Amino acid sequence: AQLPPCVISKEAKRTNVTSWMERLWQTYYTGKASGARYVHAVQLEDQYRCHPGLIQFSNRWVYRDGGPIKGLLPLKTPDAVTEQRTYEGRMFDWTMKKDATTDDDILWPMAWLDVAHGTEDSQGHGYDNSSEADVVFDLVLRLIDIGYKATEIAVISPYLRQVNMIRVRLSRPGTKLVTILHDSLEVRVGSVDATQGLEFPCVIMSTVRTVHQALPFVKDLRRTNVSFTRAKAALFFIGHFEAICSRIHKSKDWEIRQASEAWHWLGHHLKTRQQVFGCTPHVIRSLVRSPEGGTQVDCD
């Protein structure tokens, strides 16, 4: 469920060349569907990166054919126990209900900060969104104020132009953030592809786009999965909630349709859990408890 190799050759793209790993898995699933066993596979089920609530999306949309991936809790290693205590009081509640028996009982340490007033900008290749970059700046500053270390925070985006814009915002001379950090590069800012294989206690994802259409990164379930699974303890989405999560795109391509349904599912569950907010103060308060009303609460 990671990102495939980049195909640069035009001829390879034209003939739909795929990697040997993709062909191997395709053979496995073809055999599984037909009852034949062309390839024998073993799926690893234990992971020690993400809080159980953060792995729910991947279990529902990515790993469902092979069985669910187990989350970090119950804690099994001394380091994990120490890490939980470290995050206590400045994270989402890391505990699950003692009588938790279903996925719905597992707390989701994530929130969506709705930047409905933002506007995407495209000049040449790529997109950026200055309103989202400003909100990212504010959120990073507030996270550091409540006790995060800069090295515990990563900001990711599907668009390189947005990555560059956020880097500029975080390193703007004379800002309070740079004064606190001394070195703004301590906060990792990168594309989804660049952060594959990495992990951070807190991840902020800027989605950039504000138009209601079939967006490239929304159509790519594997890239979405990589974005969602970089965080160990807290995941924040910064973006236009309705544009990203409100529609299921009709497509003859099953993978595109499934990816769109996955984002819609995520949005529905975040709204149901009152984890969609309209301003950064509400998001910061949600680190302790989710205020009743979610986006219905008046913003500061």
Label for each model-derived stretch:
Residues 1-2, 110-118, 205-208, 239-240:
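Short loop/turn segments at strand-loop or loop-helix junctions that form parts
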Residues 1-84, 158-160:
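Conserved coupling/interface region of RecA-like P-loop/ASCE motor cores
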Residues 3-5, 51-52, 64, 119-121, ...:
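Eukaryotic short linear interaction motifs
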Residues 4-42, 214-300:
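Helicase C-terminal subdomain and adjacent C-terminal extension
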Residues 18, 48-51, 55, 133, ...:
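Amphipathic alpha-helical transducer elements in NTP-driven molecular machines
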Residues 41-43, 112, 189:
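Conserved beta-strand scaffold positions in the cores of enzyme catalytic domains, especially
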Residues 70-168:
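Conserved helicase/translocase motor-coupling segment
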Residues 142-145, 149-156, 160-229, 233, ...:
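Conserved helicase C-terminal RecA-like lobe
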